[in-house]
Structures are given as C-alpha cells and as structure tokens.
Amino acid sequence: MTSNPIPYTPVRFEYPFPKIRAQGTLAAIGSCFAQDIAETLLDSGMRGMVNPNGILYNPYSINDALQRLECGYTEGDFFEFNGAWHSWRHHGSFSAPDPATGAEAANESAKRFRRTLKKADFFLMTVSTATVYLHLPERKVVANCHKVPGNEFETTMLSYDTCRAAIRNACEIVRAYNPDCPIILTVSPVRHNPGDLTANALSKARLRAAASEACGKVPNCAYFPAFEILNDELRDYRFYADDMLHPSEQARKIILERFLESCFIPRAMADYQAAELRRRQSKHIPIVKPEA
C-alpha cells in the first residue's frame, strides 16, 4: 500500500456498512475525481458505469442528471454553436454533429446508467464545487459552458440550502432505484476556484456540510474523507500535480488505496494492485518493491 512518506496525523474513517465485494458493480457520478476513481476500479475488474452525462462538478447539475434518467432528452435539449450541437446538461463528450445524434447518445447513456444503478453494489457521488455558471439568456444553471462567450454567463455560488437539497434529493433518487445500495459521498480535493482560494474554501465548506447532513438523513449513506486526506493529512504541495490544483499521482494512489482498504474486502485491493502492476509493465515503468 502506498504510504505518506512524511510524518502526519491520519484522518480516521471507518466504513459503517458491510465491506463491498470485489468484482462487483459500481455506479458513480460527479467530478473528474469520481471519474478517475471509477475508471481505476473498472480497470481492476469491477463492472459498472460512471457519469451518464459526462463529468459534472456541482450538486445542482448532478441532481438534475439523476432526475432526467427516466424522462430522457430530446433534440430540443441541444443547441448549435461553432458547428456542433451541445447540451447544457452534458459534458462536451456528448456534443454531436446534429441534435438527433446528440439526443440519441444522451438517451442511450441514461438507459445504460439506469440498468447499472438498479444492480449496483455501491454508488459513489463526488461533488467538486458550489460555484456554478448561470446562462443569462435562459436563466439556467449549466453543467458545461461549451466555450460559449463568457458574457453570456454569470458566475454565482449555490447557497448551502440549495447544495443540501440537491445532494439529499440525488441520494433519494438513487435509493428509489436501488433501496439496498450503499451510497458513498465524497467532496473532491481538487481546487475548483484556482483564482480565489477563499471562494474555494467557502464552496468546499458548503459541500462538506451538505454531504454530512445527507449522510445523517439518508439510510445506508456514508462520507469518505478524500478531501480531508489531501488537505489535512497530506497537506503539502508535493502531493499536488504541476498545476497545483489536482492531486499528484502519488496522492491519488494514497486516497484510492485508503478507499479500497476502508470500504472493500481485501481481494479488491489485490485486484487493484495486480491491475496496477500490469499497467506499469505495459508502459515499461520500473517496478519498485518495498524494502523488507
């Protein structure tokens, strides 16, 4: 297991439910951090799906995506800009040459995620920011700006009450699809307001408090402290990538391995380590064995 190389005070966490089985089915939604964790688990032999609308950062858009799983999308949900058709509710990976193609891809993704959610062994949701972009002509919060000129948007921060309601409602939607599925909430450790760290702190505080309340209100719901591990346990710029915003590869491994160790049976860690060994060998990365 990857360990912190410097002295530290550990963030304590005990998963309050039965450990999740290896080779199970996951459903995940949220930021690039959720995407990274889920893809690593899928590469380790788990089944499942992450982000039916592509990467989403704020709880309002995450809740909206889950609400739309049943009713789906139409060509009217797409708009044309710069020669492509985009959806305000989707990541740019869903942009298409025409609205029919975009709507078809969005609906197929929603259908696949519904199927996955109904049989998932656990659900992971990662919120990253309470800061959102409001599209002024339509007065709506957007999940992605799609490089539309900035003068069409207003930046605002969701209130605590809005964050709380969105996260709790998202959990209730998951519970309706799969009543026994454990829900694991996390706050992404990625700095989402790089130009204003005080705004980033306020944003993360609202998300953290809202996640805590959801865990107290929604059955079978727990919080995994990814944010705290990076900011309070590792708490050093050596654990950030070159952009000083995202966790470094070492930090991601530390957080992921803590997640596996805390929430899963031991075989899940063994599967991950075997997959990581294969990955390093395929890229000809030297294998460094720990000293005895």
Language model feature labels by segment:
Residues 1-292:
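Extracellular glycan-modifying ectodomains
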